[in-house]
């Protein structure tokens, strides 16, 4: 992917999990994650994906989630309806947080203290919490397949930039835990904390539980 981008768009920046980053202050920046969900990949669980995002002036504008085993590809473009294999999709979601299905890759991705406490509190508000879907959980939310909410922490920009246009284009909401936009300039301030929801009401209810009122942070307890 990097070779193709460099050849076709030499002025564009590239922000990648692999091989580092170049020109990240460019007008257009590609954000790449060749394999999101490495553990799923190496164990043959088809919940990993290739993530390709394009940011314009730091804002995620185009996103692709590609699951090669299941032959599923979600394409999101800001201002345009998200498509799965060419067909429009729309997030649905339960009307209340108490009925929602919550996803996260692992409960061990939340740092001890603020993150773990607030995620645990949110888990107490929902119907059920499930784990282990990696980027595929966001695709399920965008497609209206019964996943309502994804809340994660300790993410890199390459983990979520491609997901934002996919969620927004499906009618969902996706921000950091304070309800602020996920952009390149705000990546550090967002602390890798992400909240994606199938609709605005669910998102607002989740943010009320997650919101970082004091800017607190703590030691991470990450399971790589």
What feature does the model see in each segment?
Residues 1, 5, 38, 67, ...:
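Residue-level signal for inorganic ion chemistry
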Residues 13, 62, 147-149:
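Short, Asp-centered acidic motifs that coordinate Mg2+ and/or phosphate
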Residues 24-83, 98-100:
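DPxDG-like acidic metal-binding loop motif
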Residues 16-18, 86, 133:
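Short loop/edge segments at beta-strand edges and connector loops
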Residues 1-35, 201-202, 207-224:
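N-terminal subdomain of lithium-sensitive/metallo-dependent phosphomonoesterases centered on the IMPase/IPPase/PAP
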